[in-house]
A protein has these predicted regions:
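N-terminal edge beta-strand
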Residues: 23-46, 144
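C-terminal motif of bacterial Sec signal peptides marking the signal peptidase cleavage site
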Residues: 12-15
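Bacterial signal peptide processing site
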Residues: 17-20
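Beta-strand cores of secreted/periplasmic/IMS beta-sandwich domains, seen most often
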Residues: 40-59, 85-100, 226
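Beta-strand signatures of extracellular beta-sandwich domains
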Residues: 63-65
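Extracellular/periplasmic metallocenter environments
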Residues: 29, 79-120
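Bacterial N-terminal signal peptides that target proteins for export
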Residues: 1-5
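Mature extracytoplasmic or organellar-lumen-exposed domains after removal of signal/transit peptides
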Residues: 117-364
């Protein structure tokens, strides 16, 4: 899931803009260029760190990731030319990889010194335990809902499969940043056709979605359904072994809103079924759950920020309300550009204060 990372060592501080913040955490400036992340080599002492990322005219590098082995510890996506973003984490000693997007070279981050034990904070500990339970519950429900969906696909029952599709999607979209942290699992489960590189097989929910809504058939989909069950089972196994930091909850909430802006508002996510608002709501649900769990700690540190974020979540709920139809939503193709702009504005209004939560709690 999403997290953060580092600062430059003393020799690099000037060149990459690293500094201590007022609360003792570290900040490091990262530039996205067509040559990749700059600087490409970082060394930083262990402890709370915030990456501040700016796109310096690149159309290739539009994200920043910190990886440990095959796991993505932290990331910030969709940073196009002129935009910036940040994320935070309490880094432990070790060697990490940085990455700025397809076609760019990977960099190296070395975290030095002794492990920094987070200060005892019962509220943050409770938030992490609560989120762990939430993710586990969602992935169990995902497995069950996916199996019902894939059983209908294998049985050739197109209408039943269509009816069951949304229930599985909701469970996945609520915890998508967790799935994304496990390397290739998210592409296997959730890739859209334009995400698939030449020579790779397209698998997952959207491959079946296309067959159901554009062809009205499940012909050839049984192997795709089998693999989807397998990949969801693997996700459950990985979730059972996962652990989280408080900043990951906050960063994951921000990334869920990024998902809304990137693919739900545009109508790209569910381009065949037009169930984009179902996914939109699920992303917001997941983000809100993380915030609700973190709010007691945030109230102590910055109650004004906590109230602002809560109010902006209410604003998103109000923006979605006209499109609700019982437990579902209208076909997204019926939502006109002006209405989509209003939805986007509500999400953007929430995203800005929500992005401050991670940096606030990481120094708690």
């Amino acid at each position: 899931m999403l997290v953060t990372a580092a600062v430059a060592a003393a020799l690099l501080l000037a060149s990459c803009g690293g500094s201590d913040d007022a609360k003792g955490g570290k900040k490091v400036s990262i530039a996205l260029t067509n040559n990749g992340c700059a600087p490409a080599k970082l060394s930083t002492p262990a402890g709370p760190t915030t990456f501040e990322i700016t796109n310096k005219g690149s159309d290739k590098a539009t994200e920043f990731e910190v990886q440990k082995g095959s796991e993505i510890l932290g990331e910030k996506e969709n940073i196009t030319d002129g935009l910036s973003g940040s994320f935070s984490l309490n880094l432990q000693p070790g060697r990490y990889t940085t990455f700025c997007g397809q076609g760019t070279p990977k960099g190296v981050l070395v975290v030095t010194g002794k492990a920094q034990k987070a200060q005892a904070n019962p509220q943050l500990d409770a938030a992490v335990r609560g989120y762990d339970r939430y993710v586990r519950d969602q992935v169990v429900a995902l497995r069950t809902a996916t199996k019902a969906f894939t059983d209908a696909v294998r049985a050739g029952d197109v209408e039943k499969a269509k009816q069951l599709y949304a229930a599985a999607r909701v469970r996945y979209e609520r915890i998508e940043p967790v799935a994304e942290s496990f390397g290739g699992l998210d592409p296997a489960i959730d890739a859209r056709i334009n995400d698939v590189a030449k020579g790779q097989e397209w698998t997952g929910f959207h491959r079946i979605e296309q067959a159901l809504w554009t062809k009205g058939s499940t012909n050839g989909m049984a192997p795709i359904a089998d693999k989807l069950d397998e990949d969801v089972g693997l996700l459950e196994t990985k979730v059972d072994a996962a652990s989280y930091q408080p900043a990951q909850l906050a960063n994951g909430a921000v990334e869920l809103l990024n998902e809304v802006s990137k693919s739900k508002i545009t109508g790209e996510e569910e381009r065949y079924s037009h169930l984009d608002l179902v996914d939109f709501q699920a992303n917001v649900d997941g983000a809100k759950q993380a915030f609700v769990l973190l709010r007691p700690a945030l109230n102590r540190r910055n109650p004004t920020l906590a109230r602002t974020v809560a109010s902006r979540f209410d604003g998103v709920d109000a923006a979605l309300a006209p499109y609700r139809r019982g437990v579902t939503f209208v076909d997204y193709s019926t939502v006109d550009p002006a209405q989509r702009r209003k939805l986007s504005q509500a999400v953007d209004a929430l995203g800005e204060p929500l992005s401050q939560v991670g940096g606030t709690i990481v120094a708690s």
